[in-house]
């Protein structure tokens, strides 16, 4: 059975170790699992834990939510590189954050879903629109510009 990596089935995504798609490693991993991928959209889920370095007094911080969005973008880049282009992981950097609106910070034990949609990609830059939701309640929305280094992580 061949896998269509551009339109992967849920059962394939469930088998992925998300850490293999990221340049970040524990304890700085802010995403839990990849639940959806296509050429323009990616969705991750994360359980907010008390052990997370961005959790304080039972609440996941705004910085943690922003990093969660950035790492969801990184998972997309890692997935494309590893499964579509068959190359190594590249390191990305947040170039800009615009239209950031934070409505509520999630609590320990809540499961957040991060949805990133690519608006434009050109010259190693990706402009993406993102939102993080918890039980269909929007927690944060933002636009993020990500720059990707051409060289692969060693």
Predicted feature descriptions by range:
Residues 1-40:
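N-terminal leader/capping segments at the start of a protein or of a new domain
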Residues 2-8, 43, 75, 107-113, ...:
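HotDog/MaoC-like acyl-thioester-processing domains
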Residues 11, 75-113:
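Hydrophobic beta-strand-centered segment that forms part of the acyl-chain substrate-binding groove
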Residues 25-61:
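Catalytic strand-loop segment that frames the active site of acyl-thioester-processing enzymes
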Residues 29-32, 92-95, 114-116, 142:
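Small-residue-enriched segments and motifs
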Residues 32-35, 98, 103, 117-119:
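Conserved positions in beta-strands of structured domains
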Residues 47-81:
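A conserved, well-ordered hydrophobic junction motif at loop->secondary-structure transitions
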């Amino acid at each position: 059975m061949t896998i269509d990596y551009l339109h992967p089935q849920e059962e394939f995504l469930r088998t992925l170790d998300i850490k293999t798609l990221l340049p970040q490693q524990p304890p700085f991993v802010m995403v839990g699992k990849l639940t959806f991928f296509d050429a323009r959209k990616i969705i991750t889920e994360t359980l907010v834990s008390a052990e997370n370095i961005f959790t304080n007094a039972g609440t996941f911080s705004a910085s943690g939510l922003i990093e969660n969005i950035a790492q969801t973008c990184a998972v997309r880049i890692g997935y494309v590189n590893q499964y579509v282009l068959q190359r190594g992981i590249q390191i990305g950097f947040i170039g800009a954050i615009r239209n950031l609106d934070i409505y509520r910070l999630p609590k320990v034990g809540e499961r957040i879903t991060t949805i990133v949609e690519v608006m434009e990609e050109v010259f190693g830059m990706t402009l993406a629109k993102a939102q993080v939701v918890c039980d269909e309640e929007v927690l944060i929305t933002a636009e993020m510009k990500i720059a990707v280094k051409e060289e692969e992580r060693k």
